[in-house]
Design a protein with these regions (language model features):
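Conserved core segment of the aminotransferase class I/II
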Residues: 298, 304-366
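Helix N-cap motif at beta-to-alpha junctions
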Residues: 402-405, 443-445
């Protein structure tokens, strides 16, 4: 195991000698360096006495800092073996932001999940009638139902990327797909580039592997290849997770020139790109044509992840991975230790729904456009201090609060009947407190009422305690 000297930790932590309380500033400095990769995971920290001498503080101060790091999950210790850096286990935290309460009567603005389209009921009824034709085997296919893999491959081909069914692995949603890919390709201490802000479950999946998260900032204007390149070079990352199509939460859309530059960057640094296309089909306005990231890939560096949840319905729990045929098979072997295969009925339904793709896209576009207008108009009328860029697709607004803090606001809003997803959920360790993600996937009248309640929460604080959770629902 690598060691860090007391002098190295003192330099990297960069604590102002006048900071008060000093132990907390020291713990924050060490944590920040772990999160940006300057202090690697699984390296031995100096003994408390040595670090205290280097910093010219009492040993009690360093002991308190180490205790705080252990409490937060950034330090592990064993009697006689010393202490070493770590990453927190998301499952051990008191508040798990990936699961938020549902069934409590609140307006659920923490979740960007559209309702089921009209075509879903028809598709389900049809596949129930058709199921006996597919029920002669044992029902287990780790790669996914051949019919559905053909439909997904055909859609990629129609979008400009020739794809064979053997390149497709059907999964239990995009989150399952992310876990499979990261579980196979990322290990403890490996650097993984992510956007900041980004999809929270991607951070969760990488952390569960013990990977070192390297955030790279993006804005409503999009991605800067020079920043991505610099972060990849400095961190040594060989895997980057990106969402170029109506990015969650900003709604940004990456243009083709940037896609080409990013894939060229991956080629230069011998890195893989894990591309999340969950929102790809949901352009709300007319947008310039963009090609899939895989269209710029000349040497199999792009692994694409898709989902039925946003276009059709989250309850279907069907997603997929597009990769090389060899990698798709490796992922299928990897998934077999967890769930063997996906349910046939839902896969048949999604295969049917692909036949209604354009119909559903048009239905979604109309609904999202109306809901987006209601949310935007409500915010401009009732909360004009908040600013945002209206996205041309996807399902979320990334709102800058301009002086308000998202976490206290979310706590107050729950007392007014609105559940929110504050900015820190989409960043690392308390960053992005000045932002809020607001989805426009609910009906217009619900969003109008939600904004009125948000104004009351901002002006008056909690109207009462947040409802006691009745059940759990996913934050997506």
């Amino acid at each position: 195991m690598r060691h860090l000297s007391a002098a190295q930790v003192a330099r990297l932590a960069g604590v102002d000698p006048g900071a008060r309380p000093y132990y907390r500033a020291l713990a924050d400095g060490v944590r920040a360096r772990i999160m940006d990769g300057q202090i690697p995971v699984r390296v031995r920290m100096p003994a408390e006495r040595h670090l205290a001498e280097s910093l010219r503080v009492s040993r009690t101060t360093v002991t308190a800092a180490y205790d705080l790091l252990r409490e937060r999950g950034y330090l592990e210790s064993r009697q006689g073996s010393g202490s070493w850096t770590a990453l927190p286990d998301p499952a051990s935290t008191a508040e798990n932001p990936w699961l938020s309460t549902g069934g409590d009567g609140l307006i659920q603005l923490h979740s960007a999940a559209p309702p089921a389209p009209a075509a879903l009921r028809e598709a389900m009824l049809e596949v129930v009638e058709d199921l006996p034709r597919h029920g002669m085997g044992n029902g287990y296919d780790p790669m996914g139902l051949p019919l559905l893999r053909e439909r997904i491959a055909a859609r990629y081909t129609a979008r400009g990327v020739a794809t064979r069914p053997e390149q497709i692995l059907v999964t239990a949603g995009s989150q399952h797909a992310l876990h499979l890919v990261l579980g196979l390709l990322a290990g403890p201490g490996d650097a993984v580039l992510v956007e900041s802000p980004t999809y929270p479950h991607a951070i969760d999946a990488a952390r569960q592997r013990g990977a070192r998260i390297v955030p790279v900032g993006i804005s409503h204007e999009g991605w800067r290849p020079d920043l991505l390149t610099g972060a990849m070079r400095q961190s040594g990352a060989r895997l980057a997770y990106l969402m170029p199509d109506f990015q969650n939460p900003t709604g940004a859309l990456m243009d083709d020139a940037t896609r080409a530059a990013v894939t060229a960057m991956a080629r230069r640094h011998d890195a893989l790109l894990l591309i999340d296309e969950t929102w790809q089909e949901l352009a709300v306005d007319e947008v310039p044509h963009t090609s899939p990231m895989a269209a710029f890939d000349t040497d199999s560096r792009v692994i694409s992840v898709g989902s039925a949840s946003k276009l059709w319905w989250g309850g279907l729990r069907v997603g997929w991975v597009r990769a090389t045929a060899a990698l798709a098979r490796r992922l299928a072997l990897h998934r077999a230790v967890v769930d063997i295969a996906g349910p046939v009925l839902e896969q048949l339904a999604v295969a049917r729904l692909f036949d209604r793709l354009e119909e559903t896209r048009a239905e979604r576009r109309r609904a999202l456009r109306a809901s987006r207008a209601a949310l935007v108009d409500g915010l401009r009328e009732h909360l004009p201090e908040w600013t945002f860029t209206v996205p041309r697709g996807g399902g979320t607004l990334w709102v800058r609060l301009n002086g308000d803090a998202a976490t206290p606001l979310a706590e107050a809003a729950a007392g007014h009947g609105v559940r929110l997803a504050p900015g820190p959920w989409f960043g690392l360790e308390g960053t992005l407190e000045g932002y809020l993600r607001l989805p426009f996937t609910l009906p217009p009248q619900v969003l109008t009422e939600a904004v009125v309640r948000l104004r009351a929460a901002r002006e008056h604080g909690p109207a009462g305690p947040a409802p006691v959770p009745a059940s759990l629902s996913a934050m997506v």
